[in-house]
Design a protein with these regions (language model features):
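Alpha-helical transmembrane segments and their immediate juxtamembrane cytosolic regions
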Residues: 1-350
C-alpha cells in the first residue's frame, strides 16, 4: 500500500511538471491524472498515520519513558523537516519549480503526526473517532480562513513566522487542519485491523456519501472535482466532501489489498505484488529523490513549449515506474544507504 501511494505521488507530481499540450480539465486523461493525484496524498498520509500509530503502540507496550519518547520522536521530526526543506530546494520557484524553500508540505505534516503519535496511542478509539469527525468538519468551520482565494504561489509562500504558521496549520498545501483527518483515519484502521466487517460497513457508508456528492454535482450543475475552484470536491483547500471521498477510497484500497489476511487467509493478490515491497520500504527516499529529477526537468523545460501528449505520457510513466526496479536494486546492492537507513542508524538501540 505504501509503495502504491508513493508511486501515485510520483505520477501526479511528474504530470504537473510535464503537462501535455492540448489537454484540458474536461479531458478523460486529465480526469485520470487528477484521480491519481487526488488519491495519492490521502493514501500516503493515511498509511503513514497507520505506521506511526503502530510503532507508537509497540513502544508504549515496551514501557517507554518520557526520555525514550523524546529520543524516538526528535530524530524523526528533524529528519522529516530537513527532507521537506530539501524537497523545496530541489523544486524551488527560482529554478522553474513550485515551492519556496520554507514551504510546509506533506513531510512537515508527517513530522507533526510523529509528535502526536505517543498522545494518539493513549487516546481511546471513541475519542479519536470524535476527533476524526471534527477534522472532517474543519473546512466548513474554517471557511475563508483556509484560503480558497489563494493562488498556488501565495499558498506556498509566506512572509514571516505568523504567515508560515498559517500555512502549516490552516491554509498551506497540506495544513494540519484538515489533513490530520488522514492521520487519525490511519490510527482507526489499525485498531480495526482484526475487524474487517466493521471496516467494510464504514466503506459502504463512504461509498454512499460519494454517490451523494456526485448527485449534488449533477443537481447544482457544478464540477464534481477540481484541484481548486468551484467544485464539490477540491484539493486546495481540501473540502469536507473531498476528505470523505478520498478517505473512503484510501480505506477501500487498503481493504482490497488486504484480501482475507484478517481472517487468516492470503492477501488479495497473493505474492504477485511482492515486487513492490522494496518501493514501500523506501517510500521516503523515493519521495525525496524524485523531486531531484523533477527539479532538473523543471529547469530544462522552463520557458519551453509543452510536450506533445505521447512524449509527456511516456515521460510521466517512465519516471513513475523506474523507481520500482531502482528500489529492488537498492535493496540488493546498497540496502543501508537511504533516508530510512539513516533514521534507523540514528535511532539504533532504541
Amino acid at each position: 500500500m505504501r509503495a502504491i501511494a508513493v508511486l501515485c505521488m510520483v505520477e501526479v507530481h511528474t504530470a504537473a511538471i510535464i503537462p501535455p499540450e492540448g489537454v484540458t480539465v474536461g479531458d478523460p486523461m486529465a480526469f485520470v491524472a487528477a484521480a491519481f493525484g487526488g488519491m495519492a496524498a490521502p493514501m500516503f498520509v493515511t498509511i503513514s498515520g497507520w505506521g506511526m500509530y503502530m510503532s507508537a503502540q509497540r513502544r508504549r507496550a515496551q514501557g517507554f519513558s518520557g526520555s525514550d519518547w523524546v529520543r524516538w520522536i526528535v530524530p524523526r521530526v528533524l529528519l522529516l523537516t530537513a527532507c521537506q526543506v530539501i524537497v523545496n530546494l530541489f523544486l524551488n520557484v527560482e529554478r522553474g519549480g513550485r515551492f519556496e524553500w520554507q514551504t510546509p508540505g506533506v513531510l512537515t505534516l508527517l513530522a507533526v503526526a510523529a509528535i502526536l503519535s505517543p498522545i494518539l496511542s493513549r487516546i481511546p478509539f471513541s475519542f479519536r473517532s470524535a476527533i476524526l469527525l471534527l477534522a472532517c468538519a474543519s473546512p466548513v468551520v474554517l471557511g475563508d480562513t483556509s484560503g480558497p482565494e489563494l493562488g498556488w504561489f501565495e499558498r506556498v509562500g509566506s512572509e514571516g513566522i505568523f504567515e508560515w504558521l498559517e500555512r502549516l496549520f490552516v491554509n498551506g498545501t497540506y495544513p494540519i487542519a484538515p489533513w490530520i483527518f488522514y492521520v487519525i483515519l490511519g490510527t482507526l484502521v489499525y485498531d480495526l485491523r482484526e475487524s474487517p466487517d466493521v471496516r467494510e460497513k464504514g466503506i459502504i457508508m463512504g461509498l454512499i456519501a460519494t454517490a451523494l456528492t456526485i448527485l449534488i454535482s449533477a443537481i447544482e450543475e457544478v464540477d464534481w472535482a477540481l484541484t481548486e475552484g468551484d467544485a464539490v470536491l477540491t484539493f486546495f483547500p481540501a473540502s469536507t466532501p473531498f476528505l470523505i471521498v478520498s478517505g473512503t477510497m484510501a480505506v477501500l484500497a487498503m481493504r482490497i489489498l488486504e484480501g482475507s489476511e484478517a481472517r487468516g487467509g492470503e492477501p488479495a493478490f497473493g505474492d504477485k505484488l511482492t515486487f513492490l515491497e522494496p518501493s514501500g520500504r523506501l517510500s521516503l527516499t523515493i519521495y525525496v529523490s524524485h523531486f531531484a529529477v523533477l527539479g532538473i526537468a523543471a529547469m530544462v523545460l522552463e520557458g519551453e513549449p509543452r510536450l506533445a501528449l505521447v512524449p509527456a505520457f511516456l515521460a510521466t510513466s517512465i519516471h513513475t515506474i523506474v523507481w520500482i526496479p531502482l528500489a529492488i536494486a537498492h535493496e540488493k546492492y546498497i540496502p543501508g544507504i537511504s533516508i530510512e537507513g539513516l533514521l534507523r542508524t540514528i535511532q539504533s538501540g532504541r
